[in-house]
Amino acid sequence: MAADGLSSKALKVKRELGENTPLLSDEELMGLSVRELNHHLRGLSKEEVARLKQRRRTLKNRGYAASCRVKRVCQKEELQKQKMELEWEVDKLARENAAMRLELDTLRGKYEALQGFARTVAAHGPPAKVATASVITIVKSGANQAAYS
């Protein structure tokens, strides 16, 4: 019977500890390590332990979800920035492409004109008298070159 008296006394002490243990705030509950949490949960009923552990799990999941949302927003902003940069690059390349096509068309026209001239010369022979053109070369001095730049 002494053992029964001792065990009932131990249960009474545990209940008293559970009743006297201050409740943990949400911040404290999340900040505790598992070892510290288990130390705080000693003497509490199984239901109370389960309730506090579930509360801790819920709070931690809420924190993880919030950080995930922040990360997703940051990634979205970064992707939008990259998209704008790529759209700008595509526009720039389209303008360069259009300019090169224009230059290509101009060169193609000159090439076709030269081919036509070559065919004419080949079919009729060289012209009897070719008009020569004078070529004037203008050399710019350093001072004049700065004025033209």
Swiss-Prot record:
UniProt xrefs under PROSITE patterns: BZIP
Annotated region (Basic motif), positions in chain: 51-76
Subcellular location: Nucleus
Assembly information from the UniProt record: Monomer and homo- or heterodimer.
SMART domains, per database record: BRLZ
Superkingdom assignment: Eukaryota
One GO cellular component, as annotated: nucleus
Gene (name only): MAFF
Listed PANTHER family: TRANSCRIPTION FACTOR MAF, TRANSCRIPTION FACTOR MAFF
Purpose: Since it lacks a putative transactivation domain, it may behave as a transcriptional repressor when it dimerizes among itself. May also serve as a transcriptional activator by dimerizing with other (usually larger) basic-zipper proteins and recruiting them to specific DNA-binding sites. May be involved in the cellular stress response.
Example of a GO biological process term: regulation of epidermal cell differentiation
Tissue: Highly expressed in the ovary, lower expression in the brain, heart and mesenterium.
Keywords: DNA-binding, Nucleus, Repressor, Transcription, Transcription regulation
Domain bZIP: 51-114
One of the record's GO molecular function terms: DNA-binding transcription factor activity, RNA polymerase II-specific
Family: Belongs to the bZIP family. Maf subfamily.
Region Leucine-zipper, residue ranges: 79-93
Species per Swiss-Prot/TrEMBL record: Gallus gallus
Keyword Repressor: yes
Keyword DNA-binding attributed: yes
Protein name (database record): Transcription factor MafF
Primary location: nucleus
